[in-house]
Amino acid sequence: MSLKKRYRETIQPKLLKDLSLTNIHEVPKVMKVTINRGLGEAATNAKSLEASVKELAQITGQKVVVTRAKKAIAGFKIRQGMPIGCAVTLRGDRMYAFLERLINLALPRIRDFRGVSAKSFDGRGNYTLGVREQIIFPEISFDKIDAIRGMDITIVTTARSDEEGRALLSEMGMPFQSN
């Protein structure tokens, strides 16, 4: 059963009861997943940006947006408009497919994995996760990468509090650390 179908049929009714909500539309849901990769070396090394864009496109199955510097910072040796990273925003079916792959395939492949931190919520039910290496995703072949780079994954939910957000992600199967 896909994550989207499981959310509709089992997770939504369970959260409605557990969070003691009255309306099905009050139940928190995932709105979007944003994957971001900041590349400091992109200012000097154009190949690293190309490789990153290709990797994120492979992981997400969607076109990647190159992020550019808003203003010049001499200390970082960047000028306004220089490419400094890349990002992808996933919604709908691609979002659920990515979350399913992240939870069931990618996270368990992290070395010495003991669960993700439960403290990475922002106060409004959104969760951000930092991944140190892209090779945890099955789409990326270790032989074809030029360098190991990480990325930030932000899961934006309609939850009103961190507790609601955590309940939603726990039901979806996110492996939180037990402190």
UniProtKB/Swiss-Prot annotation:
List keywords of the entry alphabetically: Ribonucleoprotein, Ribosomal protein, RNA-binding, rRNA-binding, tRNA-binding
Give the function comment from the record.
This is one of the proteins that bind and probably mediate the attachment of the 5S RNA into the large ribosomal subunit, where it forms part of the central protuberance. In the 70S ribosome it contacts protein S13 of the 30S subunit (bridge B1b), connecting the 2 subunits; this bridge is implicated in subunit movement. Contacts the P site tRNA; the 5S rRNA and some of its associated proteins might help stabilize positioning of ribosome-bound tRNAs.
Relate the assembly described in the record.
Part of the 50S ribosomal subunit; part of the 5S rRNA/L5/L18/L25 subcomplex. Contacts the 5S rRNA and the P site tRNA. Forms a bridge to the 30S subunit in the 70S ribosome.
Which family does the UniProt entry place this protein in?
Answer: Belongs to the universal ribosomal protein uL5 family.
| The keyword DNA-binding is annotated on this UniProt entry | no
Q: What processes does the entry annotate via GO biological process terms?
A: translation
Q: What is this protein called?
A: Large ribosomal subunit protein uL5
